[in-house]
Amino acid sequence: MAAAAARWNHVWVGTETGILKGVNLQRKQAANFTAGGQPRREEAVSALCWGTGGETQMLVGCADRTVKHFSTEDGIFQGQRHCPGGEGMFRGLAQADGTLITCVDSGILRVWHDKDKDTSSDPLLELRVGPGVCRMRQDPAHPHVVATGGKENALKIWDLQGSEEPVFRAKNVRNDWLDLRVPIWDQDIQFLPGSQKLVTCTGYHQVRVYDPASPQRRPVLETTYGEYPLTAMTLTPGGNSVIVGNTHGQLAEIDLRQGRLLGCLKGLAGSVRGLQCHPSKPLLASCGLDRVLRIHRIQNPRGLEHKVYLKSQLNCLLLSGRDNWEDEPQEPQEPNKVPLEDTETDELWASLEAAAKRKLSGLEQPQGALQTRRRKKKRPGSTSP
């Protein structure tokens, strides 16, 4: 049933335990998908992206450097490719013109033949984008253009069909009022639709807008939110504002035209790892270390629409962009079918049952001793009535 209903899932979430979770918000159901049966932490999901076929195909980037192809129509994994090179986890994943684009922590960006299953083949292109990468983001309007940034690694824009040098390299802001250098820590990047501008959020709670068409390479707009590192960011449907999340579970909407705070969203209890707005509906999906997927309404009245506890720490998510969320057909339920137990809770229930049996066997002896003591009190000759 999970495979048959996979196409109707609204949100896909990658977990720290290596499980891909599909969540249907209308039915309030979550299904687990794994390539090898049992989940392994060595296969923790660190990146997700849609394939070139739209939302029928998904690419799943894992900690063991494999990129798995998942069919959302059939609910099954359809192969994988090992992408070696560099160190660390995937910080970005993309697909363009039959090629696969990967980028890891150590700053190695590689382009691969997407259909090539030979793991020993060399990449088509390799770029060194600088160490400490936190995010690689593809330009939706130009799939061969990507942006990178990280800790002490300033924002850069790369044309994968051009030279091996960045087409834009951001310049750090001027020294602060103490004439001290301002550190760099770009955590997330987004391309603004209909323009060449980009927006970044930083580990020092800054939101910055860059314009490569401008003569200056410094930000054309900068604002701050809160006191804690910003970890994730997404564009709102209109493209005039962004929603950012930080390490304390705080969410806020920032206007990119004036740099002011438009409002906040409540409910999160842990560091935010993934954010995505629906392209046409006023909905925001968020996930993080508190293991809960939340769907907020971002237009007045703001508030929490859905909340699903998913048992594992959540690293990333993809939100379906379809509009017919409420129009999906109701598939018939199979009679007398026993649901499969969740692999994440098998060991927990087994340990609880064993503990209960030990406790029950230990209680049998004290109960017998208690009855003996009560009988002794009622022997003949006792002064008790």
From Swiss-Prot:
Record region (Required for nucleolar and nuclear location): 320-385
Disordered, as annotated region: 323-345, 360-385
InterPro entries registered for this protein in UniProt: WD40/YVTN_repeat-like_dom_sf, WD40_repeat_dom_sf, WD40_rpt, WDR74/Nsa1
Chain positions with N6-methyllysine modification: K311
Pfam families membership: WD40
Record bears the keyword Nucleus: yes
Statement: the UniProt record of this protein carries the keyword Phosphoprotein: yes
Impact when changing W185A: Reduces interaction with NVL
Basic residues bias (residue ranges): 372-385
Keywords for this protein: Methylation, Nucleus, Phosphoprotein, Repeat, WD repeat
Source organism, top-level taxon: Eukaryota
Transmembrane segments: none
Function text: Regulatory protein of the MTREX-exosome complex involved in the synthesis of the 60S ribosomal subunit. Participates in an early cleavage of the pre-rRNA processing pathway in cooperation with NVL. Required for blastocyst formation, is necessary for RNA transcription, processing and/or stability during preimplantation development.
Name of this chain's protein: WD repeat-containing protein 74
